[in-house]
């Protein structure tokens, strides 16, 4: 068996090496093909057999062939294509949104595409982040995405910004681009990106996706100066206050359906291409002042019950007079940003802090729980293990004997009292409320379990301290680390 495992490992290593070599050859081929393409110039020289003549058309021959299907659209045409070619787009985030968005910008022939991301590719990314591949796991996302984009279209210039966007580097990075896409997944980055776009007068296309829902909005278009209320609203105009930290759910916690985030990323590219082809990113002459398009928030939902997926548009107001970033009395400045005068983490409520609702003696480690479960029933009976993860997590993997009670069900106020207003937890299994067996609560990482354990105590299930009720420190993540390393953890 060990010999077979060793051989399998050797084969995997050889496959990875061959895939890396193949990827390198593909990139060399793309570079060679790009080198033979007539350069971007109105006076490109092209060889026709043994003779040469002056190329008199505004695009190179390869570009007419590549972009022909969109060139014949009234909304693009030759002028629109020339605007796309001359334009530059910055995509902040090379993940589920940034991958499809960057692919369609590259396919459309946008002249320069910049990618900002400091993360590396993980296997858990691959079901939705379509520019990455198995052979590039561990590679910086911007490098992985650009290798994919170069193969898609070698005629585009690609810039890799191998770090996260911060208040200190935002100005130097964003200033070199005509349009910005917010493809991040956290409020702190969304407010930062919006603020720097206001200060540098850059249009912004922002989107988000979680579970089976998504939303998109075009901001700061037209990109008027601060205090000019004729400009498009910024992110702070739409969301003056950030959501509380506990209400922010990541893809890792809430899940995401790949095509949903793909739809939103493609829509970001669509809005960006429309904006660039129409020249709405360009500063108009005085007689051609742009008028702000009535902003709207586009909502997408693919209901899990199988009903038809669809879109809904919600009209939004324009710029707010009292907006901190773009309003009439805004004090926001590039100097403040450069000097770190704005703490976006603090503004958004800080990092989510570990929950500390129970005393240390009310908590057990995963190893301790495992030992307790292996023992014979004590004088108070066999321990009761309540797993308060949502059903989908529980069904993937669970501890044998655990009873699943989804946390969302435990927080339903209507289920806490019976008709006579006597304290009762209707979601508890029969026999648990009136029994004497110790109760252990486990969740994903040890936060929700504390909430439920305290709730059980508040309703008197601990028999005035005679019955143990507590939780498992670190939750199922600790169980994987300390007890069962094979447990699939989501």
Curated annotation (Swiss-Prot):
Pathway, per record: tRNA modification; 5-methoxycarbonylmethyl-2-thiouridine-tRNA biosynthesis
Catalytic activity: [molybdopterin-synthase sulfur-carrier protein]-C-terminal Gly-Gly + ATP + H(+) = [molybdopterin-synthase sulfur-carrier protein]-C-terminal Gly-Gly-AMP + diphosphate; [molybdopterin-synthase sulfur-carrier protein]-C-terminal Gly-Gly-AMP + S-sulfanyl-L-cysteinyl-[cysteine desulfurase] + AH2 = [molybdopterin-synthase sulfur-carrier protein]-C-terminal-Gly-aminoethanethioate + L-cysteinyl-[cysteine desulfurase] + A + AMP + 2 H(+)
Gene Ontology biological-process entries: cell budding; cellular response to oxidative stress; invasive growth in response to glucose limitation; Mo-molybdopterin cofactor biosynthetic process; protein urmylation; regulation of pseudohyphal growth; tRNA wobble position uridine thiolation
Co-factor: note: Binds 1 zinc ion per subunit.
Top-rank lineage group of the source organism: Eukaryota
Residues that coordinate or bind ATP: 96, 117, 124-128, 141, 185-186
The protein's required cofactors: Zn(2+)
Domain Rhodanese, chain residue ranges per copy: 379-488
Principal location class: cytoplasm
Keywords from the named record: ATP-binding, Cytoplasm, Metal-binding, Molybdenum cofactor biosynthesis, Multifunctional enzyme, Nucleotide-binding, Nucleotidyltransferase, Transferase, tRNA processing, Ubl conjugation pathway, Zinc
Enzyme class: transferase
Keyword Nucleotide-binding appears in the UniProt entry: yes
Location in the cell: Cytoplasm, Cytosol
Cysteines joined through disulfide linkages: none
Classification via Gene3D superfamilies: NAD(P)-binding Rossmann-like Domain, Rhodanese-like domain
Keyword Protein biosynthesis: no
Active-site residue numbers: 251, 443
Annotated region (Disordered), positions in chain: 33-54
Residues that, per the record, bind Zn(2+): 234, 237, 323, 326
CC terms in the record's Gene Ontology section: cytosol
A GO MF label: metal ion binding
Family from the record: In the N-terminal section; belongs to the HesA/MoeB/ThiF family. UBA4 subfamily.
Protein name: Adenylyltransferase and sulfurtransferase uba4
Phylogenetic lineage: Eukaryota, Fungi, Dikarya, Ascomycota, Pezizomycotina
